[in-house]
Amino acid sequence: MSTHLPWAIVWLRHSLRLHDNPMIQRCIQEEYRPVVLYITPSRELEIDRWGFTPLGPHRKRFLMESLVDLRSQLEDHGVNLLYLEGDVIEQLSLVSTSLTSTKSIKIYADREYAYLDQKIEAEVEAAFDVTWFHAQLLTNPDDLPFSVKATPHIFSKFRGKIEKYVTIETLTEETNWSKMSQQEAALSALLQEYTKALPCDADDTLPKDNRQAFDFRGGETAALARLNDYLWNTEYVTTYKETRNGLIGPNYSTKFSAYLSLGCLSPKLVYHEIKRFEEEVVANQSTYWVIFEVLWREFFRYVAWQHGRHLFWPGGLQHKPVKLRTNHRFDAWYKGETGQPFVDANMRELNATGFMSNRGRQNVASYLVHDLGQDWRAGAAYFEHQLLDYDPCSNYGNWNYIAGVGNDPRAGRKFNVAGQAERYDAQGEFTLVWAD
């Protein structure tokens, strides 16, 4: 690619991959010279009202591993990846003026669906020439038999309409890297400095716990390896429905969620690989149930898009008049010191690894809200701080459910935690693993 072609910015938010990446594909197809950009917004690094930084150490390490992996792949094609932190508009302006001496640069970006992210999108759209893509969704919003504002309130109705009326698109056409050569024009010294700001390797100051259920390594390379292993090498996908409520070990669940949250794995790729597996190996309830869970993820994105800021309000999607509080009980909960063994074991796993099973999440959330009487938003914020697979739509959507202010037709999800422990940890093995 010759040096006279104009620069363009590919601003990746949570699509940290080369496969099924319409932003990069379109940029190169339209014969721009891409600079791939990732920005950690200021709020992710600042202490929130509950005393936590949204981007906690586990999440940050997983993010950095993912960016290092992506940068390595991009460099093989002669493309730079820049990592910045701070105000999004300021950082985009800095890169734009460094590349073109003006702000009139083309930007390709993936859309987000939570309120604050969409607020940023509106500001960016007002300041720059942006082409947006729904790279994080399984479905194309234009194909839905309902508008976003008319998204069904109940998941079963949403799922029914998707399965009946929507055809999932094929993956984005592969990027034609042959159009690219090593970029002849070096980036400015300023931008080269930003390129170096990304660690060359993962942060080793946060040791991994050998009790962890799965050795998560960030990045598209690890994500594709996990997908291939879970489906094709081991065929564990064929028993997913029976094992998904497990607590110990790497293969009781898919472990795809962390890779989906950063976009190291495309939801469309998961869907089409499952369909291919069903055609070539076997189709059963378990293979369908993986798609079922991907549809839950999709549902929460449309719900967040539909309801905006209400997803984060005390009264949630139902706008309930509620009085919420936090006190020393919340501190005991997040430290894993409530005295309830099953709750404490799950919280200790989260604190040590950044991961918790789906069964564990439901129980600890219910216990915080219904047994300890604490503000559900504090629990959601702590999950945001710790979870490798955090995304605002699924996280806050699920907390709305548990707190009884969300889409659940029932009043709330109060779990009998002791009964759950007897059912899912009958021998106490999981609790023992995470006992002090």
Q: What are these language model-derived features?
A:
Residues 1-170, 348-349, 394, 398:
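Trp/Phe/Arg-rich N-terminal binding region typifying the photolyase-homology
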Residues 82-94, 128-133, 177-192, 405-412:
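Short secondary-structure transition/capping segments
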Residues 149-313, 421-436:
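Glycine/tryptophan-enriched, flexible segments
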Residues 249-436:
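Active-site-proximal binding-pocket segments
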